[in-house]
Amino acid sequence: MNKIRKGDEIIVITGRDKGKRGTISLRVDDSYVLVDGINLVKKHTKPNPLKGTTGGIVEKSMPIHQSNVAIFNAASGKADRVGIKLLADGKKTRVFKSSGEEIKAA
């Protein structure tokens, strides 16, 4: 079970974007996540008339390693850790470590 999933609100805990918040839009591989508006880089693109793209400098979000982000706990307003709790019916659920509150599915 992945502790961080698509749709989770996260906060960046290290790097040049430290403190910024966003929502995970895609999980890349097993250890990278793509967050809208975080880790922006400038890509220089060549014009391609076949694809209908113009050349220039484009800002693009790049993947960030999941160890550099933490799930955001809206109740406390801080970053939090994720724990796995086994329910009585045998299902697993994600909970915040600080409060034990269940994380709502996105």
UniProtKB/Swiss-Prot annotation:
GO biological process, any: translation
Pfam families the record matches: ribosomal_L24
Entry superkingdom: Bacteria
InterPro entries for this protein: Rib_uL2_dom2 (IPR014722), Ribosomal_uL24 (IPR003256), Ribosomal_uL24_CS (IPR005825), Ribosomal_uL24_KOW (IPR041988), Translation_prot_SH3-like_sf (IPR008991)
Coiled coil: none
Keywords: Ribonucleoprotein, Ribosomal protein, RNA-binding, rRNA-binding
Subunit structure: Part of the 50S ribosomal subunit.
Family named by the database record: Belongs to the universal ribosomal protein uL24 family.
Protein name: Large ribosomal subunit protein uL24
Organism: Polaromonas naphthalenivorans (strain CJ2)
